[in-house]
Amino acid sequence: MSNIKTRLQKARSKFSRRNSEASTRARSIASSAGSDRHGHAPPPPLSSPLRKSVSLPRLAEPAASGKALGLGAHGDDDDDEQLLVVGRAATESQADAEASTGSLNTSRDGRSSCTQASTAPSSSHDARKPSADVPIVCPQVTLDAPTPVHPGAPPAELDRPALPDSLSSTPSSVPATTTTTATTTATTTSLPPSPARVHRHAAITTAHAADARLATNLPGPDDSQAATPSGPPPSTARSAAMLHRKIWVKRPNASATLVQIREDDLVDDVRDMILKKYANSLGRSFDAPDVTLRIVPRDSQRAGERTLGPEEDMCRTIDAYFPGGQTVHEALIIDVPSRRTPKPSPRVPPYYHHEDGIHPQTEYFPPMSAMTPSPATMSTSLQHPHDNRIPVPQLHSISVLNTGQLPNLPSPGSTRRGPMHPHRPKYNRTHTASPTTLGGGIPSSATSVRPANRPRHDSSASEAKNSAASNNPIPTPPIPADPTPHQQTLQTSTPPTPRISSPQLNTKKKRRKAPVEPPALPAGLLDGSVPPINVLIVEDNIINLRVLGAFMQRLKVRWQRAMNGKEAVTKWKAGGFHLVLMDIQLPVMNGLEATKEIRRLERVNGIGVFSSGSSEAPNTRLGSDSKSQDELREDDKLGDKGMFKSPVIIVALTASSLQSDRHEALAAGCNDFLTKPVNFVWLERKVKEWGCMQALIDFDGWRKWKDFADKSENNDTTSKLSGSFTSVAPNKKAANTSPTTATSETNGVKKDAETERKNKRKSLGVVPQPVLREEAEPQPAEVDSGDN
């Protein structure tokens, strides 16, 4: 009784959920049984219980038939349960009649019972007990269409030789019975029901579950009929094949490769897969949006190849262009944008024998990559590989700075001196001490620096000598002044001495400067070093003015001063100045304005390069306006144009070191730029440079100044003239000397030398105008008072 009560409780709990479902499934089973392929007519008892209310006395016959079919009975308690399965029992009886050996009756909720045909019926494991308080009726259900139910599957341990016909007839049909094997005679026990699996279908395996999902998602007669009763169950590979696909792609003029995509992928998605496939060549340099795909139609009638848009469906496009399937020759072409970054030089492979040395190289890394093999090749390789390594010396100047090593020089230099003659002298390595790092780097560098050394190196040293003695000349990145001694020291350790010769050159230069520095020098040497030029110093600071005046005295040149730009222009108009040291920041008129005014006056009066004979542009420009031209001639006319042989040289003086100030000064017309404080050495060089230039431009005028200076020494009246007309040679009769006249006794010369110069040169000078004398007279007094 306990077993019966337990089953009754289970039936009561499930009756409420499956009340309507039982009748619906019973009707579905009845309809499917009537359309099965064996042509059996539906039994008459199936229709009446489903459409009419059935009373208790009339349920005896279906109950008895259920007991005879092996459903099992336990007295009157099983009658209520049989109401729920009356339609199912009738269907099962039809299936039992068709079976030849035995029957395995399976209920829709996963419960089954098996009986043997030749033995006595066994007790059923599937009896369910309805509760007493639930009304035992079979409700009448009217269905417009069969309810779709997922196809079920038998347990894994049972064979399935054939599927029921109901599966192929309609998707709502459910296989109700399965036959056991012909040799089975033993009674098999049914699987115990599980409450979690009682929803719509029984427990199925993973492979059958995939089939069930496939049938649900893709309903259709073709798919249902494809599952033939005799074929094996489909596997998960079929569903995977429906989701993925492979297409052929390739780079231009390259081999094709397969790329796996999905059925619903767009061209934009395919580009991501392509970058994964070409991870090195494309993935490191390009992004997916940069890649484009071109498709070439198979038919010649179609339009030419075109670029696929990122929004196109890839699979549909492939199917449209290639109906029979894409072949390897019809692969999509991958296009990427051309590189805009400069590529490395094609003449820079890891080894130098791939390069040609005709043009200079600027690559850094190739020499470094070939440093290791080059020392070995200098002793083992033939001459031909060395001849191919011509560009090595051109790259060495850079490799020395990068790594401090010169390993590649010896091997190419030992065999290819001839072809390198016109190129290697350009790259001198005297500025680096790197040759001491590796052996074999210097023999070729020593011979390559000077073309004359290379033929001697070929004649005196062989391949074996170069390889054997390559370690000795390591410290010689030579600049030998004499090629022959350098060649002799090539095989010895003495070559470092030519490197030390560079400081000796500096000492020689110092020796040359030494004669210039002493104040008392012979007149002949003075005439050759500092020409007798006239300098105008424009400076508003009295301290700077005195410093520059002292410099001029040491150089023994004539000079005058001006305190502002307007005064400088006025003094320049007097003529006779070769150099103007112009301060930029000045009162009244700054240095830039004064410079522009001087240049304008030079252009208007046609001085030097601005004369009509040398340049027509200024005159033409001024001739366009006759009135302004006449006014300029009246206001800006110079007194004696013979005093202006060439444009004056103007050097800007400023305490600012800004590049903009330099550009502004040069644009205003200055010839040079000098930053304060002034260095005497620099000033000395500039005075020589500009003075010699003026002497070359106006040699006749320079001779006039020299002759006039000689006359001034013998004429006392000339001592009253402006300092601009005073000779470099001092006048010994002058008791009070000033820096403007530069006539101190320390700067004087012997009378014998002065008389000799007067005898050699004849005076061609012209007496200066009195205006200059008036302007120059007050200046010595001011400077003298400042000096005192």
Curated annotation (Swiss-Prot):
It is found in: Cytoplasm. Residues 534-691 form the Response regulatory domain. Disruption phenotype: Shows little sensitivity to high-osmolarity stress and moderate resistance to the iprodione/fludioxonil fungicides. Impairs phosphorylation of HOG1 under conditions of high-osmolarity stress and fungicide treatment. Pfam families: Response_reg. PROSITE patterns: RESPONSE_REGULATORY (PS50110). It comes from the Eukaryota. Its main location: cytoplasm. Keywords: Cytoplasm, Phosphoprotein, Two-component regulatory system. GO terms for biological process: phosphorelay signal transduction system. InterPro entries: CheY-like_superfamily (IPR011006), Sig_transdc_resp-reg_receiver (IPR001789). The modification 4-aspartylphosphate is found at D583. Two-domain response regulator protein in the two-component signal transduction system of the HOG1 pathway. Controls high-osmolarity adaptation and fungicide sensitivity via its regulation of the phosphorylation of HOG1. Belongs to the SSK1 family. This is Response regulator SSK1. It comes from Cochliobolus heterostrophus (strain C5 / ATCC 48332 / race O) (Southern corn leaf blight fungus). The lineage of its organism: Eukaryota, Fungi, Dikarya, Ascomycota, Pezizomycotina. The gene is SSK1.
